Amino acid sequence: MFGKTALVNALVSAVSAGTILWDGRFNEMSSSADLEKWSWANQVGNYQYYIHGSGAVSKYVNLSPSYKNQGDTGSKQGAKITIDSTAKWNSDMWRTELIPQTKAAINKGTVFYHFSIKHGTTNVPSATNEHQICFFESHFTELKYGWVNGESGTSNTNLQWMVGGQSKWKVELKADEWHNVVYEINFSSNQVTFWHSTGNNTLVRTAGPFSSSTSSNGADWHLGVLRLPRQGNDGTGAEDWFFSGTYIESGTLTTSVVSPTA
């Protein structure tokens, strides 16, 4: 029965799949140490790895089959991305981020940025700090978690989708619940749309389209987390964030959690 189910899932994924422009699913990596093969002088692999703390790569990024969304049979493993008090890069912000290494046109026409995200029950993220997640440098669209500047109160456990700094969708982020996300970005018409599901459920259009200044040079989307400091309300201790099924496609949107064959 398992074999039949896997075959059906594969066929469904194949039928619905678009064209993968960039594959960031970690399928070809043996460990996170492979990230250190990349440098500005030697731009190899699928990720640029330079936004992190001073520790070893294993302090900030680790890979394992147990870190992926188990509903995604197209991904061999997922990533645990950690931020802590040592994860500072050119500021007092806590940051561990990976950037696509590609010459593909991931900033042209209509493209779909896929990823799944969760946190666990260990090293739980601080709800009193603003987290910018899977963002573009111009912040025309991104996720946020925790208390966001301008909100009332001192904490917020919602995961929010933002467009130009404005919240367009939110849900409580519970431990060990996968949130599957697609940013549908039309760089030609300057619009963004949000697709979402949980667990192994099919993605559905959830919010948008909204007009936005969709500016990107093709090397400024950050997979990972940036945490802003907040005097008097800073959380303490490391935070673990999990990412799975990361890729960018064009053409027909893959709405299945089962990511397609590259």
Predicted segments — roles?
Residues 1-20, 262:
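Fungal secretory targeting signals
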Residues 17-173, 187-188, 204-262:
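Low-complexity, Ser/Thr/Pro/Gly-rich disordered linker/stalk regions
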Residues 149-153, 194-199:
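Low-complexity, flexible helical/coil segments
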Residues 174-193, 199:
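Localized edge beta-strand/strand-to-loop motifs within extracellular or lumenal beta-rich domains
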